[in-house]
């Protein structure tokens, strides 16, 4: 949705997409089955219930990001950047590595998406046209997030054990967080409104909260008194898992009774299993911050639900707890 306006970007998807992907004129308002050979992004005027404009592509649209100024269309191996007007005006076009999850984060001026090499993040400045590259991981990317002020970028790879924090525009690493030791699929990364915390969800059905450093600082060693492993974090020759920075607080969220929801080992180097669905699976663990102390996690699919969590401090330590939930399709 374009802010709080009447315009919505729609893409047909799933096994039987009902929003038209074939030829649509502005006066068409009927729901029809899609033409599998044509792939479109529709800009829908919800007030007049008409398609205001559309873009057509030869391959499936993995994801769309939209603001009041720009429309970003993510294909499997390409990202197109358009000025939002009728018709949309293309201003940039970039090849990417395979991107079946449609990874893309859009800020006010910065667009972050995978580069042409595995593990790379490209940051495009819509105001200047300048590009920056971060070599973030050795493995394919699984998640990307921009901070509200666009001065930090969070990344995770398909290994899912580490989350890295980068300063922008310097593109230097300022922190590295350990989600866990076992591999996992990261579902979502999201900065709090004031960028003091980073929330992370994974297919381990866990929500992690990490406290963030100032983007102008460099990495510092954590206080052993507040570290998960205490004084062991300072012992030499121990595996790095003992010295890494862990979440300040964690709690469980519900994946729901979704067939195959936890079986998300699909590599980002392969195509999605279900046409029209990024990553080939229903969205799970999508994070949204309502304010600096309240999180909502949304899951789609057959067992679609939202859960509300509150983040706070008690006895000098961070905590996160569930406040409510609802199955929103019932």
What do the predicted segments below correspond to?
Residues 1-4, 13-21, 38, 95-99, ...:
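Terminal intrinsically disordered, low-complexity extensions flanking WD-repeat/beta-propeller proteins
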Residues 4, 51, 60, 100, ...:
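WD40/WD-repeat beta-propeller blade-loop signature
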Residues 4-5, 68-70, 107-108, 150, ...:
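Conserved loop/turn motif of beta-propeller repeat scaffolds
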Residues 8, 71, 111, 153, ...:
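Hydrophobic beta-strand positions that form the internal "hydrophobic ladder"
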Residues 16-42, 78-83, 118-122, 161-164, ...:
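Structural motif
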Residues 42-50, 81-95, 114-141, 158-175, ...:
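Per-blade loop-tip surfaces of WD-repeat and WD-like beta-propellers in eukaryotic adaptors/scaffolds
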Residues 48-106:
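Asp-box/WD-like beta-propeller blade repeats and closely related beta-sheet repeat scaffolds
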Residues 59-65, 95-109, 119, 139-146, ...:
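Canonical WD40 repeat/beta-propeller blade segments in eukaryotic WD-repeat proteins
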């Amino acid at each position: 949705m374009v802010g709080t306006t009447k315009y919505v970007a729609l893409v047909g998807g799933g096994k039987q997409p009902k929003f038209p992907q074939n030829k649509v004129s502005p006066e068409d308002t009927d729901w029809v089955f899609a033409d599998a050979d044509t792939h479109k992004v529709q800009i829908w005027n919800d007030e007049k219930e008409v398609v205001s404009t559309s873009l057509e592509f030869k391959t499936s649209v993995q994801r769309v990001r939209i603001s009041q100024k720009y429309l970003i269309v993510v294909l499997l191996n390409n990202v197109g950047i358009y000025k939002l007007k009728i018709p949309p005006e293309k201003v940039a076009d970039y090849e990417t590595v395979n991107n079946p999850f449609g990874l893309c984060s859009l800020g006010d001026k910065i667009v972050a998406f995978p580069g042409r090499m595995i593990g790379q993040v490209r940051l495009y400045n819509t105001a200047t046209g300048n590009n920056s590259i971060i070599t973030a991981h050795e493995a394919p990317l699984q998640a990307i997030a921009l901070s509200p002020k666009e001065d930090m970028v969070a990344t995770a790879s398909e290994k899912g054990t580490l989350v890295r924090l980068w300063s922008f525009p310097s593109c230097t690493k300022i922190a590295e967080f350990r989600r866990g030791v076992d591999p996992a699929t990261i579902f979502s990364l999201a900065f709090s409104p004031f960028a003091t915390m980073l929330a992370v969800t994974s297919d381990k059905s866990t929500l992690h909260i990490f406290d963030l450093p100032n983007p102008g600082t460099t990495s510092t060693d954590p206080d052993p008194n507040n570290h998960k492993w205490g004084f062991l974090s300072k012992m030499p020759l121990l595996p790095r898992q003992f010295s890494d920075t862990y979440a300040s607080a964690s709690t469980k969220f519900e994946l729901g009774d979704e067939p195959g929801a936890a079986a998300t080992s699909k590599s980002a180097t392969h195509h999605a299993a279900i046409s029209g669905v990024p990553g080939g699976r229903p969205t799970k663990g999508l994070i949204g911050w309502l304010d600096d102390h309240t999180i909502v996690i949304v899951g789609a699919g057959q067992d679609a639900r939202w859960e509300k969590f509150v983040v706070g401090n008690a006895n000098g330590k961070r905590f996160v707890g569930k406040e409510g939930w609802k199955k929103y399709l019932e």
